[in-house]
Amino acid sequence: MTSYTPTYRIKVAGQTVTGATLSGLTITSGRNDIYTQPSAGYCNLTLIETALSSVDYEINDAVSIEVTNSSGVYVYLFGGFITDISITVATSSTNVITQRINIIATGALARLARAIYTGNLSSDFDGDQIDFIISQLLFDKWNELSSSLTWNTYDATTQWQNAENNGVGEIDTPGDYQLDSQNNLNGSIYSIASQLATSGLGYLYEDSQGLIGYADSTHRSEYLSQNGYVDLSGNDAIGPNLQIQKKSGDVRNSITIAYGSAGNSTVSSSDATSIGLYGSLASTITTTLKNQSDAQDQADYYLDIRAFPQYALPRVTFQLQSPEIDNTDRNALLGVFMGMPVNLSNMPSNMNGGEFQGFVEGWTWTASMNRLQLDLIMSPVAYSLQAFRWTSVPAAETWNTISPTLEWLNATIVA
């Protein structure tokens, strides 16, 4: 049994909000499934104001939401920029007026959607192309700096590579796939970067501070092999909201990959067994892959992991103030991120054998003064990693080459 009461810290334009009281908070991040690139994070925040203090917030002001963890240390839940502000009289009397200040903010990916890139892209790996394209917006150019800026007033601890960085986070460079060159581009930076990420079998994301990152095709498997799963118990989740789901819409048994600068070349792969069971469920994925061999590898990869349906976990809910959640699990949940590997045990035995292993795709925080709820959306591990089938293991493999401490649940990621 552990005691936990969340304490929140809200900053607007770098200044901590001190007078108003948090009334309600909803934060949504990530995506609903593995098939699309994520949209911008969304924050809906309500403050209660009783002193008629001046409200100096402005559109595009930076906003961050933090909460204390089990050790009392503040950790980030959200970072973004204000898009809407409203002030409403909630109650009034002769002596007291109570107001609701509602702030809506979006994450940094929204900035990519409203910025246009015109120009060319030279052939390069996926991570390098994405790093280039988003840096056009999120790094200030030399002539964009204030003319009154002087060297002795600049932060002396800033590294040159991150100077004037307005939102670029961790980008996996160079990436795993060589992409073709593109000429005469004219579109939103978000749509261009999303296409590049899909071409590289990766995804864009926002971290908890609002920085934009890119995870390449091997990011999840590398993280899992180095850090393992976050182990959580279904006993700590809210039972009525725990759900697993298997859908025919998740099956892909005939894959066509379009590749090249204009997507005019194609390769295909299909699974006769899956087609015999479920009928032909075809999908065409347009990429800018440069090499035919990479396109064929991707077609085979999609087929390996999606020819047969797997249970996903579209919702599981945790109340972080619950004394049943220990401090280790609570802190892990507070650090949730897109691609976090989770092993959820102690589920009902008729739900996927009582255990689910997956990656977090999206999440929603719902908060009030003394309450903090987290809803997770998870995809099965098999949709992100190429799990070996027994017959696919090399014939020359011997038992004494496998780590004696390897657990069966982790064997799917060991070649």
What do the PLM-derived regions correspond to, one by one?
Residues 1-18, 120-127, 191-357, 365-370, ...:
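Acidic, small/polar-enriched beta strand-loop surface segments
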Residues 1-128, 366, 371, 377-385:
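Beta-strand-rich assembly/attachment modules of structural machines
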Residues 71-74, 91-247:
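Charged- and aromatic-enriched interaction segments used to assemble
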Residues 71-81, 348-359:
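Short coil-to-beta-strand transition motifs
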Residues 6-10, 20-27, 63-65, 159-174, ...:
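Generic structural motif
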